[in-house]
Amino acid sequence: MAKQYDVLFRLLLIGDSGVGKTCLLCRFTDNEFHSSHISTIGVDFKMKTIEVDGIKVRIQIWDTAGQERYQTITKQYYRRAQGIFLVYDISSERSYQHIMKWVSDVDEYAPEGVQKILIGNKADEEQKRQVGREQGQQLAREYGMDFYETSACTNLNIKESFTRLTELVLQAHRKELEGLRTRANHELALAELEEDEGKPEGPANSSKTCWC
């Protein structure tokens, strides 16, 4: 039976409550958009497999609550992330200003070398815009991040941003990938995904390894 994936790793979506993190997740994984969502309580996640440069990548994408009362819970997930989206709402200057706080949390709790992308979401709401595209680009440059404006509503830059963060994580693990490319059946000797943290889409495959 063909392998379902070659590597597995974890991405996080962080940012203020209401910036559209859950909508981004649902659009990418299920190609669905709902204009209203119940605020995430603690954390939730979905899975998706994509192929990048011939590597089948299984991505575990965690959607974290933005409310302050859940911060102690959500920060526990930073330390095992390989990639993080920092999300603000272009129609909310407040959410943009809070990116500095989210970056500080990443610096404190996430592993060194974690890959990051800045997202200005709800780009379809141009008439409500409070944060210019140039502001997002400038902030991303200050923190050394790639930047995308996205819209889960219109599907703008959803695939592109998730694919790019996946590429960045793979590039950061190029040594492991060199072994993977030269020995197609070799499985990376890395920590196994903890099955008790959620319910993947299908039965767990005990032979798979991950970068979590």
UniProtKB/Swiss-Prot annotation:
Q: Where is the short sequence motif Switch 1 located? A: 31-45
Q: Which Pfam families match?
A: Ras
Please give the cofactor(s) recorded in the UniProt entry for this protein: Mg(2+)
Q: Which reaction does it catalyse?
A: GTP + H2O = GDP + phosphate + H(+)
Q: Where is this region: Disordered?
A: 192-212
UniProt binding sites for Mg(2+): T22, T40, D63
Q: Where is the lipid attached (S-geranylgeranyl cysteine)?
A: C210, C212
What biological-process terms (Gene Ontology) are attached? exocytosis; protein transport; Rab protein signal transduction
Q: What's its membrane topology?
A: Lipid-anchor
Q: What is its EC number?
A: 3.6.5.2
Molecular function as annotated in GO: GTP binding; GTPase activity
Q: Show the SUPFAM superfamilies listed in the entry.
A: P-loop containing nucleoside triphosphate hydrolases (SSF52540)
Location of Cysteine methyl ester modifications: C212
Q: Known activity regulation? A: Regulated by guanine nucleotide exchange factors (GEFs) which promote the exchange of bound GDP for free GTP. Regulated by GTPase activating proteins (GAPs) which increase the GTP hydrolysis activity. Inhibited by GDP dissociation inhibitors (GDIs).
Domain topic, free-text comment:
Switch 1, switch 2 and the interswitch regions are characteristic of Rab GTPases and mediate the interactions with Rab downstream effectors. The switch regions undergo conformational changes upon nucleotide binding which drives interaction with specific sets of effector proteins, with most effectors only binding to GTP-bound Rab.
Describe its function.
Answer: The small GTPases Rab are key regulators of intracellular membrane trafficking, from the formation of transport vesicles to their fusion with membranes. Rabs cycle between an inactive GDP-bound form and an active GTP-bound form that is able to recruit to membranes different sets of downstream effectors directly responsible for vesicle formation, movement, tethering and fusion. RAB15 may act in concert with RAB3A in regulating aspects of synaptic vesicle membrane flow within the nerve terminal.
What family is this protein classified in?
Answer: Belongs to the small GTPase superfamily. Rab family.
Subunit architecture:
The GTP bound form of RAB15 interacts with REP15. Interacts (GTP-bound form) with MICAL1, MICAL3, MICALCL, EHBP1 and EHBP1L1.
Q: What is this protein called?
A: Ras-related protein Rab-15
Source organism phylogeny: Eukaryota, Metazoa, Chordata, Craniata, Vertebrata
Which gene underlies this protein? RAB15
